[in-house]
């Protein structure tokens, strides 16, 4: 029976510790999760690795926005792959597209070669590619380990039909593992377990904490005006624990039915 994987996306040491406490199997480490995540600093990776005994895959994304990268941006990505390989990351989470929405095979091959023995996840660039079936096939040719996807929808429940189709293709030898992401909650995992054969799930399990600042200067945003500078997003260990419980229960039920 395939092993279930619960991956938690985190952007701080505190969130990494909460994910580990809740029973996550693996971390995806990034910075600025509130904007979808960008590449984390090496110091953050080192602290997380020192504090948490979990495999860490590092999201590499040089900026917010699309996945069509300039040569300068690509060189940054390539250097980051090398840096995190040398630092001991279990894997990297990457994705490059061309202007027509196809997987940029030349760039992907270079990044994967730089990754060496690290595992490679194709991130949600997959969700904005033009042809997901062809992209999945190409990802298999590249030797990509996992694809994180919502099924090309805002949330994975909406993308379940495509996720089911991809999961069927996954059974072919050597094809990437499908990891459902976007809008993942314990209840969503339960629905997927009941209706699909997907065994990998990605969630952030965010809660919002109020800042400890006593003095507050309102109406001075540091980034997007809609963002509240005094709200801190953090992983909720209890949500991670509930998600893990759902997976363990489903695994036990599956074993009993075999």
What are these regions (language model features)?
Residues 14, 33-54, 72-75, 96-116, ...:
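Active-site-adjacent beta->alpha loops and helix N-cap segments on the catalytic face
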Residues 26-38, 83-99, 144-157, 196-217:
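Glycine-rich phosphate-binding active-site loops on the catalytic face of alpha/beta enzymes
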Residues 63-69, 212:
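A short acidic, helix-capping loop that chelates divalent metal ions and anchors anionic groups
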Residues 1-9, 49-50, 217-220, 255-257:
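N-terminal amphipathic alpha-helix/helix-capping segment at the start of soluble metabolic enzymes
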Residues 11-21, 68-80, 127-142, 166, ...:
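Catalytic cores of alpha/beta
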Residues 21-27, 52-55, 88-91, 114-118, ...:
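Glycine-enriched alpha-helix->loop->beta-strand junction motifs that scaffold or abut catalytic
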Residues 37-64, 103-125, 160-185, 225-253:
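Alpha-helix-loop-beta-strand connector modules within alpha/beta enzyme cores
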Residues 4-8, 27-29, 56-60, 92-94, ...:
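Hydrophobic faces of well-ordered beta-strands that scaffold small-molecule active sites
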């Amino acid at each position: 029976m395939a092993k279930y994987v619960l991956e938690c996306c985190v952007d701080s040491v505190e969130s990494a510790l909460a994910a580990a406490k809740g029973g996550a199997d693996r971390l995806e480490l990034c910075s600025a999760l509130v904007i979808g995540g960008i590449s984390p600093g090496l110091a953050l990776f080192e602290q997380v690795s020192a504090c948490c005994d979990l495999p860490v895959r590092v999201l590499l994304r040089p900026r917010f926005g699309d996945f069509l990268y300039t040569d300068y941006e690509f060189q940054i990505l390539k250097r980051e792959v090398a840096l995190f390989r040398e630092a001991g990351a279990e894997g990297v989470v990457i994705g490059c597209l061309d202007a027509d929405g196809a997987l940029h095979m030349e760039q992907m091959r270079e990044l994967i070669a730089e990754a060496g023995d690290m595992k490679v996840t194709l991130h949600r660039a997959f969700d904005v590619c033009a042809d997901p079936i062809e992209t999945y096939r190409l990802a298999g040719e590249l030797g990509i380990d996992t694809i994180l996807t919502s099924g090309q929808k805002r949330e994975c429940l909406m993308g379940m039909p495509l996720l089911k189709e991809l999961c069927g293709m996954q059974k072919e030898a050597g094809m990437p593992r499908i990891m459902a992401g976007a809008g993942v909650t314990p209840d969503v995992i339960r629905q997927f377990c009941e209706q699909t054969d997907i065994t990998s799930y990605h969630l952030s399990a965010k809660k919002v904490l109020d800042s400890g600042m006593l003095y507050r200067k309102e109406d001075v945003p540091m980034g997007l005006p809609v963002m509240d500078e005094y709200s801190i997003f953090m992983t909720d260990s209890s949500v991670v624990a509930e998600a893990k419980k759902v997976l363990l229960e489903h695994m036990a039920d599956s074993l009993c039915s075999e």
